[in-house]
Design a protein with these regions (language model features):
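Gly/Thr-rich phosphate-binding loop signature of adenosyl cofactor/nucleotide-binding cores
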Residues: 72, 77-209
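Beta-rich, aromatic/charged-enriched effector core domains that present basic-aromatic interfaces
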Residues: 1-73
Length: 211
């Protein structure tokens, strides 16, 4: 943010005097809260043709195409981004760290797969968020929290993978020699939070950052 000037005043300091509102991002999800549902994206003909091929060629790989939910075209990703900005972003900060089995995405944008695949860029996302904020004023803990996740944590982890991926994949820092049991791959460990996270990854190929 210092380099880019995002959410900073003319004097160079953060707007409202704080770089981080992380302490305001840990609220418990109320039982009666209504969570906006992302619009369903229609599958393209390419997706429909590829799904049976994937099931055939990668049948031994984790996961399934049965719950495929991702957009595959830029215009559809922009629709999801706009929906997040208008319907979810204002409460993103409050419940950023909340996890609840009633909804695996909650108030997150779930745009990381599209960034990873190159369908959309962090710059484009931040630009759209800030444009909306100028007219509609997203709450600061949500605005700062979301920007921190996109240009901070997401880009930081991307840099780690780019620089150290081979080392991370091949080194055994803790000198472990036992194999993971099957339950760690199908979500039957008997620990509900862990099993929920594993099954989410298997079903959707996406995980909440707290998971």
């Amino acid at each position: 943010r210092k380099k880019s000037g995002i959410v900073r005043g003319a004097d160079g300091n953060p707007i409202r005097g704080k770089w981080s509102y992380d302490e305001d991002n840990r609220n418990k999800l109320p039982k009666d809260i209504s969570i906006p549902k992302f619009p369903k994206i229609n599958e393209t003909n390419h997706t429909k043709k590829l799904k049976p091929i994937v099931e055939k060629l990668f049948k031994d790989h984790p996961g399934s195409t049965e719950n495929f939910w991702l957009a595959t075209e830029f215009d559809d990703v922009v629709k999801l981004l706009n929906f997040f900005i208008k319907e979810k972003s204002n409460l993103f900060g409050d419940y950023e760290d909340a996890v609840n089995q009633k909804d695996n995405i909650l108030f997150h944008s779930a745009l990381s797969p599209y960034i990873n695949l190159g369908l959309i860029t962090p710059e484009f996302i931040i630009q759209k968020v800030l444009e909306f904020h100028k007219k509609n004023k997203i709450r600061m803990n949500s605005l700062e929290g979301y920007i921190r996740q996109v240009i901070g944590w997401r880009e930081f982890m991307r840099g780690i993978y780019q620089s150290y991926s081979e080392e991370m994949e091949t080194k055994n820092f803790f000198k472990q020699n036992r194999k993971m049991k099957k339950s760690w791959y199908d979500g039957t460990t008997g620990l509900p939070p862990l099993d929920y996270a594993i099954k989410n990854a298997l079903n959707y190929g996406w995980s909440h950052h707290i998971e």
